[in-house]
Amino acid sequence: MEVPRASPNQEPLCSISPSSLVINEIITVVTAIRKTTRWRNSGVASILGVSTLKDEFLADGLESRWKTNGEKSSSIRYPLVMEFSQLKEDLTNRASLNGYDSLKLLSPFLRTIKSPRMTGYITSLCLSAILKFFSFRIISEESPNLALSMRNLSFAITQCRFESFDASQDEAVLLRVSRLMEELLRGPGKAVLSDDSICEIVETGLSMCCQSRLSQVLRYSAELSMTSILEKIFERLKYIDVKTDSEDFWDASEEHSIKGEEFHYKKITEGDEISNEIDPFGIGSIREVFRVLVSFIDFGKQKFSDNIKAMALRFINTALEVSGSHISDFPSLRVLITDTLCKSLLQLIRSDHTALLTNSLLVMTTLLQAMPGSLKLQQELFISYLISCLHIPSTTPRERNVETSLHKVVSSLDLSEEISPDRATPTSFTERKRFAFDTRNRPPEVRELIVECLGSLSRIPYFLIDLYVNYDCDPQMSDLAIDLLKVLTRNCLVDSARYSTANVPPLCLDALLNFIYYFHEHLQPCYNDPNNTFKDDVAKTLIESKKRKAIIIEGAELFNESPSDGIAFLTQHSIIKQSDNPTCIVEFFHSTNRLSKRVLGEFLTKGSNSHILNAFISAFDFKGKRIDEALRLLLQSFRLPGESQLIERVLETFSHYYMSANPDSMSSKDAAFVLSYSIIMLNTDQHNPNIKSQRRMTLDDFCRNVRGVNDGQDFDRNFLSEIYKAIKENEIIVAEEHDTELSFLYIWSKLQQSVKITEPFKRSSSNVHDKIVFLEVWKSIMAALIYVFSTATEDTVFYRVVNGIQQATEVAAAYELNEPVDYAIERFCQFTALDPSSVPGTQLNTAIKVEDRIITVSELSVRFGRDFRAQLALLVLFWISSKFGNIIDASWPLLVQLTICLARNNLIDNSFLPGFKLFGYQWFPFPEPPLNSGKPALSKEGGLLSALSSYLSSYANDEPPCPTDEEIQHTLCTIDCISSAKIDNFLTKLVDLKQPGLNKLLDSLLSLSNPSTSLLTDENTVDDNKVSSVEALSNIQSAIVADLLTSLFLGTRESLNKLERRTQILSYLLFQIEQSGDEKVINQLSLYIFEMFMDDDLKLSENSEDWGLFSKLCNLLNDKNIVVRNQSLSLFHQLVNKYPFLLESWIGLQLVQSAVNTNTADIDDLYRLLSKIPTNLLDLPMFQVYLGCVDTLIQTIVKQIAQILSKQKKGASKGLPFDKSILDNHSAELNDAFNLFLKAAVEYKVDSNESSEHFQDTRWKIIYDHVCKLCLSRSRSLRAASLSCLQRIVVEQLDQPHEVSYTMALFHLVLLPTMENMITVLTEKPEHKIFGLAQAQMFNIICKTVLIDMNVLSAQKEMLHTLWLKLMDVAIKLSSIHGSESMAEVMESIKNVFMILHGAGALAGPTIEVDPEIPDHLIKTWNTTWNNLFIYYPELSNDLNINNEAEMKKENLKNPSQTTTV
């Protein structure tokens, strides 16, 4: 069966019957009472209880006769015991105590507690029983008569009396008393206790805490209970109506006095009647409790020890923590805090007692967090003193790892000691300490406590911002925010531990990081001001206020040196409205405390400034003040000069205005003058340390000095006695010139007077002021953080500092502030040691294969891999740069130079650069260090001789020494760090920069126009014997800058002045090409130029400025004979598609020529370029260049074919398969190249009027010369392609209209000379027999040419005869060389020609005897043919069928109409 669980809200909580539980407690207490000697004979009634007879058994006098021995009843002799018995009897028959009277239930227990005849043990039992009643909710909020029972209970426990026998038992009683008081406030009584009860409870609790005779454990326990009690008391402030309190509550009466540690409340004695109507406690008791707590820490009273004061401070802190800002809503409590409490705290913080100082600082910190709006002046005084205590007199030392410029920045933040004994403004540390009349150097432990206090304040979200807004921008206040930052900055440096403890630097660092954290936190949208439109107005107001303050400070300093100059300066800046108006001048004197008291006194007492003196004194309110009080008020504002004449001048004016304010105080102003002078003399007499006490002026002496000056009468002696006493006890001083308690009290009174006229403390609730404050403080904070970074040795410090710097840069970026981001980048660049001034040379760089990759080991990579600080700096550097690229301004050159340094040492590759993704190139002109194939040198193992041997052998092989394993590991660490830094992401995302950051980067890149000096700023970095190193640096810089410039220009989507930027970038690139001698770099730069000209926004024309730049590029490439790479060729090809006129220009053709002459790999690109050239539009010189390019292209292809054949031949000898496809591809390329000759022939139109004499000057002749020259090549493939091309060109030419002379010129100037050259040149070679086919092909071409152009040649038969004889001569020569049997193709060709000529009648045959009309030359031609040709080619006669031919001829002669023509 499941047992039902009790609900937590059920009453009571005990599992047994509540009546039984109470009865058990009664039995326990009564049993303990019976066992005592005094109560041992209490009788059976204490056991059986009290019962009465029923009515029917009672009779008059019967009951009295039943009493034993005539003794008194036990109820009379032992009423306390009988009361317990009566309660037990009453509860015996009750199953539940709901609705039972709580006062009746507690009454016997309370009487026992108050009884002085009870032992401590019995009292302790009663207290425990009551505690149990509350714990088990036997007494709860619903109990009847609860308020009265709680009032009686509080009275009982505060009046607890018992017989003391055992000290430990006594303390147990007190422990339970304190526990029960705590339960009263925490339990059901918290809502019904009266003001008097609260005061009684707190008074009792404080008494227990302060009794030194009690054990330390009991006092600690009582303190814990008091802490809990005070929490509940001051929690009530949240629910009390503020209107129940009044600021005028405190008066001079004893009842409402703000002084004294005694409680002021109506105390109830044993015989007093307690009213049934009780009001719950409220502001009255809370105010009284707080007043007593404050009185415990009164600095002027030495009644309490430091430990008691420390305890009171803890109680006060508890009250402030619980009540929070609500406590400032009550005027009387606010007065108590702002005056009495703060004055005591500001005096206690000078203590060296650890507990007292700790708790004083804690209370002040809690106050500033709970109610800063009411403590503006007190907060200034407090923080100023703390700053002065943390001042380090020495300058910042120079650490080994700290860069000079950084050290200068940090050193500039040191606060100098400004000792100016006559200045009223608390600007120097000495003067700040005087506010607490403390000129000692605080111990190290005290400095640590002060830093911890400032650290707590730094965790207030708007603390620094509120300081700046309320103090730094207030002309009358100190620069608390700036000074606080300076002192924290100075103390966060490691050397400050010499003046304090080792914990101070990290504590100060933590405070600075807190400030940065809250700046960063306020960037969240929830902190935005809903009235964001007024943010600019607020910022403008703050800036103007800060400027005004600076002017006032400068004017005051100038006044202290020269009053006239100071007034003129202040008038010029409208601080003093009119310099000739004494009222305006005096208003300034009274409005600032920055003037020197001495200088002001000298200025006012000058005779020429009497009108200003009158205006100055008239501004004081002397009404109702005694003359010494008025004089004290006046002389606090300036130092009275020592000359009697000047003193008299001041006192005469003072007397006049004093009598005007107090006409009834004395008879005349002369009397006031004499009395004032006497008071000054009395003040000097009483407080001059050089006068012995026996010779000091007495009251009688003072009265005698002023006898009869009051219009012939004496002043009242009591009046003079009060003056004498006031002067004797309190010297008239200028407070800032003394270090006494009196000076502090004066300054404090002056502060209280200034509270009413001081602007209220402005507490921030949004980030409206953050930007202005951050702009003012960022440099000091970041300088400190970076300084710590440079000297830190622990990982935690590194990471905290880095996190702080990251947050600071995020804040700067959010407010679009360039300088903080640039500052961080500049410093971290220095930490990486990759800046130009510290980069080592690259002469010893060596490449080595590690696993499956090749790495470059350099001095830079090894050094960087060893330096953890440098690696972390690199990570942070590129985190900042990547995230806030749009904010970077002046640090772009550093980032570019760092990238160049990495590239120079092969620590990044082309994939890092934006051009890699944007342009798709696969190669970049990085340095190529020698590849070291040896094993790593010994690093730690191995002897000196082996290491030396390895070193020398490496130089003998003309290579750097092989790197050690350790160096390789450091290099790998460097590579990993660079990869983690994500430099590639940073560089590739540069194209996404917004304006104006994009223009700033472009300007920075263009400024690096002289690479030989831009990176080598340190003379020591350049070795005169290593000029090549400088050139290498120049080359890599040029290439990287060019990549960035081109990528930014072409990859950005931002608006640019494209015309201007394009010209700048192209000019830069051309300049670098002109200066560079490295072909790889020039190629890469030319690639970028081609990319620039491919821009869609560029409209290139021959009259534009860009055309001149393009022409310059082409000229440079030609002049330097640069091998143009394939990607550049592809871009040029695209450019040609976009601007076809490029190939019609001499510039474009020159570029093509340069590419053809130098490039040996990109045949397709070259062919496409050449094929696009419109040869018909080229003039003759350009045409010659074009054909030369085709010729060179053909030669290149032939060389490649030869190389392939050679490789395949070698492969065949090794049994490797023959790849015919490669050879076929190149053969196709060769045919395509020859087609370019044909293309030129096709596009060229022959002038039909052109004579044969001009043939050699025509383009035909140029084309034939190139093709025929190639026909003489020893390469079979080249000869075959050349002959094929030649034949097609001939056909193409003859297909166009022409004269016979043109044809004959073709034969005699081109074909036949070529044939002769082939016979002559090729026959001379040893392997001439293998060229027979080529000669036969050439002869075949000539014969075909005759046949093709027979229609033209037939008209000039004489020319045909000559041509035939020449052909016959060639055929004979070929037969003599190769034999007729091997020249079948020649014989076939000559036969065809013969038949055509013979058939056309151009050549006579064997029938010439038949026709006597045939000319002699035909007969001669035939005879020559018969006698020569048929001798060498006898088969030819049979093939030609001469006899049949003769018969046919005869028939033709008979029938001329049937003559056949060709």
Swiss-Prot record:
Stretches forming HEAT repeats: 1102-1139
Q: PROSITE patterns attached here?
A: SEC7 (PS50190)
Q: Which domain of life is it from?
A: Eukaryota
The protein's matches in CDD domains, at most eight in alphabetical order, are given as: Sec7
Q: Name one GO molecular function term.
A: guanyl-nucleotide exchange factor activity
Give residue numbers for the modification (Phosphoserine).
S411, S420
Q: Name one GO biological process term.
A: Golgi to plasma membrane protein transport
Q: Ranges for the SEC7 domain?
A: 541-730
In this record, what's one Pfam family?
A: TPR_28
Q: Where are the transmembrane segments?
A: 119-139
Q: Quick one: signal sequence residues?
A: none
List the GO terms this entry assigns under cellular component, sorted alphabetically.
cytoplasm; cytosol; Golgi apparatus; Golgi membrane
Record's bilayer topology term: Single-pass membrane protein
User: Mainly resides where?
Assistant: cytoplasm
Using the record for this protein, list the coiled-coil segments as residue ranges, or answer none.
none
Q: What is this protein called?
A: Uncharacterized protein C211.03
